[in-house]
Amino acid sequence: MLGQVRSYDGDSWVDWQWVGDHLDDIRNAAQTHLVLTVEVVVLGVLLALPLSLAAARRPALRSIVLGVSSVLYTIPSLAAFALLIPYTGLTSRWTVLIPLVSYTLVVLVRNFISGLDAVPVEARAAADGMGFSHRQRVLRVELPLAIPAIMAGVRLATVSTIGLVTVSAIIGQQSLGLLIRDGLERDFRTLIVVGAGLALLMAITADLLLSACSRALTPWRRAR
């Protein structure tokens, strides 16, 4: 991926000349890592939201959804990749997407349900008294009031996914994990530092941005 590693000062943690020579490769790895993370989280939200809305109203379904998502979360990512490779292929994006989306569900579903459970009974009663249909009540009352818990789940899922995407380098998926893997294989610390550092920076930045989005979507909380 990154060509030959030239000799460098072994006492230095980062070979800045090498970094400058491979900026395009590093940028591509970071961009692919970010895109894959966004795909995983978006798919996770699209699955978790309807599941949570249905499970919040049905105790039996809630137990099933939470139980299944928890079981999926216990499967190691490498084992999940190995199980899927015969069906999706070694280089298929779905080999990574399916397990990582499954992992987000345990975080997203629990937070979404907690947020819906926290909606005051009085708010639901007021919506019913105003003649809202069930759909209107969910869209205009319950989901807005559940936003803090929903966004907390999205933040946690995003940060954890950024870390998990690095593991996909084991099966050759392009990401910042490839830098770390190549650095370990070549005993070249610059690759390790750049890959791990950018993944950490991406996680911190994503968390701050999502936290700001959460505050922007809940102006009534700032007024307290």
Task: Show the residue positions of the predicted features.
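Periplasmic/extracellular loop-to-transmembrane helix junction in inner-membrane transport proteins
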Residues: 4-41
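Loop-to-helix entry region at the N-terminal start of transmembrane alpha-helices
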Residues: 25-36, 85-107, 146-147, 191, ...
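Cytoplasmic-entry segments and transmembrane alpha-helices of multi-pass inner-membrane transporters
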Residues: 28, 51-84, 100, 110-114
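Membrane-embedded alpha-helices of multi-pass transport/permease systems
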Residues: 46-51, 95-124, 147, 154-162, ...
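C-terminal transmembrane helix and the adjacent membrane-cytosol boundary/short C-terminal tail
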Residues: 59, 114-117, 121, 193-224
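Glycine-rich helix-loop "coupling/hinge" segments at transmembrane-helix boundaries
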Residues: 86-87, 164-199, 218, 224
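Short cytoplasmic-facing helical segments at TM-TM junctions of multi-pass membrane proteins
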Residues: 111-150, 176, 180
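Transmembrane alpha-helices
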Residues: 134-167, 194
